[in-house]
């Protein structure tokens, strides 16, 4: 039978959290917020543009217990919420736009919309890539973190229903039971995009994501998709 991981399309492993609701978090991606923590352990990672031309990350996990520490946690936005709404994910962030707040009310999302980083904590001693820390040039918004332990406390204390059965995968993945379940991306539009660091799509499998100038380190991510939509600015967005 087809027993695929809801987030990756791969075969479910022996430790797959069957019947557990997926968990999504909002992570800051401003330059001063880097380096982030915990992103590499996510089963799925979204990067979407928000107001002002900046982007934010939304890592999504099959099992919140796998989160050692993640952050900096940032405020929620409706474009991310709309992605996870059909899956009724636990959505963790710190603060939210008025549009996001209205979406949560309209869809009666209740305790699944967590607005304090799941009792998140401040790491005032963190040092960013420029050597800045809180009280030494780093803004407070870059210091909020949470963990699987914190999330579990929130779920337990608030009696959040984490039971959810998924009958399909997040995307229409190629069936992992095929002999070669890898789509060839080399002829896609994105493969024609190049930078001084090389092609965006490499070997039909990996996409290079570039945020700033090259520092002789290249980051390659597997199972990556690019989705283009027409943005529409909204009034009333909060930081």
Name each model feature, range by range.
Residues 2-46, 51-230, 234, 239:
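A surface/extracellular/periplasmic glyco- and lipid-processing/surface-interacting theme
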């Amino acid at each position: 039978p087809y027993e695929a991981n809801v987030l990756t399309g791969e075969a479910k492993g022996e430790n797959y959290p069957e019947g557990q609701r997926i968990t999504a978090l909002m992570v800051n991606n401003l330059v001063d917020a880097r380096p982030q923590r915990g992103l590499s352990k996510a089963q799925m990672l979204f990067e979407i543009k928000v107001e002002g031309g900046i982007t934010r990350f939304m890592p999504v996990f099959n099992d919140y217990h796998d989160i050692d520490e993640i952050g900096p946690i940032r405020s929620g936005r409706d474009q991310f919420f709309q992605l996870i709404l059909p899956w009724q994910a636990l959505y963790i962030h710190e603060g939210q736009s008025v549009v996001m707040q209205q979406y949560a009310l309209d869809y009666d999302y209740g305790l699944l919309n967590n607005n304090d980083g799941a009792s998140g904590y401040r790491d005032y001693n963190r040092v960013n890539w420029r050597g800045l820390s809180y009280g030494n040039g780093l803004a407070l918004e870059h210091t909020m973190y949470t963990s699987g332990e914190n999330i579990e406390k929130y779920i337990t204390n608030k009696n959040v229903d984490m039971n959810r059965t998924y009958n399909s995968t997040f995307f229409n993945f190629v069936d992992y039971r095929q002999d070669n379940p890898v789509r060839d991306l080399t002829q896609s539009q994105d493969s024609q995009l190049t930078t001084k660091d090389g092609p965006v799509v490499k070997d039909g499998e990996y996409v290079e994501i570039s945020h700033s100038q090259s520092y002789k380190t290249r980051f390659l991510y597997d199972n990556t998709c690019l989705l283009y939509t027409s943005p529409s600015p909204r009034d009333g967005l909060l930081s």
